[in-house]
């Protein structure tokens, strides 16, 4: 118990001294994750006005907030999460479990027949702390996100997803390379150094898989 307490204290100390946490508080952003996305978007110039953007695993809303900030009042931002999220101006949000067919169908109905320019996925399972459990759960969510992009992302569009390095990672990246002209692995500055997370970016969705 004492170890857990020390671990919690260390996390709290790191969290409140984190420059990205302070920046988020100062700028009214919902999470420090907004700055991971900001770096990724700017580096690869992924956003343009009038785009249709889907944000999977959106809560508490930092990514959707960042997208809306960059594209202004143009385009559409559609967000989904198993956790509820307070409303954000200009963001269409669905509260539900992406793994459930009924929720996915409802989200697709919100989207209509509109092709998507950019699919973002920051989804992650609740961590058990056991890698042999967490990694397969993470990869399952990643497969669902890839399927969604297959079905709704327009030819030439981009797909950005959070992944944990571990079993299944290399195979997943290979699958992305069959679908996109260019695939890059990114570790933004706002990602904590000890975190296994990286972001895989697929650009130039192909009309047909290789």
From Swiss-Prot:
Q: Which residues bind S-adenosyl-L-methionine?
A: 61, 63, 81, 97, 122
Q: What is its main location?
A: cytoplasm
A molecular-function term among this protein's GO annotations: rRNA (uridine-2'-O-)-methyltransferase activity
Database matches in Pfam families: FtsJ (PF01728)
Record's catalysed reaction(s): uridine(2552) in 23S rRNA + S-adenosyl-L-methionine = 2'-O-methyluridine(2552) in 23S rRNA + S-adenosyl-L-homocysteine + H(+)
State the Gene3D superfamilies in the record.
Answer: Vaccinia Virus protein VP39
Active site: residue positions: 162
What keywords are assigned to this protein?
Cytoplasm, Methyltransferase, rRNA processing, S-adenosyl-L-methionine, Transferase
Q: What is its EC number?
A: 2.1.1.166
Region: Disordered; residue ranges are 187-210
A Gene Ontology cellular component where this protein is annotated is: cytoplasm
Record's function text = Specifically methylates the uridine in position 2552 of 23S rRNA at the 2'-O position of the ribose in the fully assembled 50S ribosomal subunit.
Q: Which PANTHER family match?
A: RIBOSOMAL RNA METHYLTRANSFERASE, RRNA METHYLTRANSFERASE 2, MITOCHONDRIAL
Q: What is this protein called?
A: Ribosomal RNA large subunit methyltransferase E
Q: Which organism is it from?
A: Stenotrophomonas maltophilia (strain K279a)
What gene does this protein come from?
A: rlmE
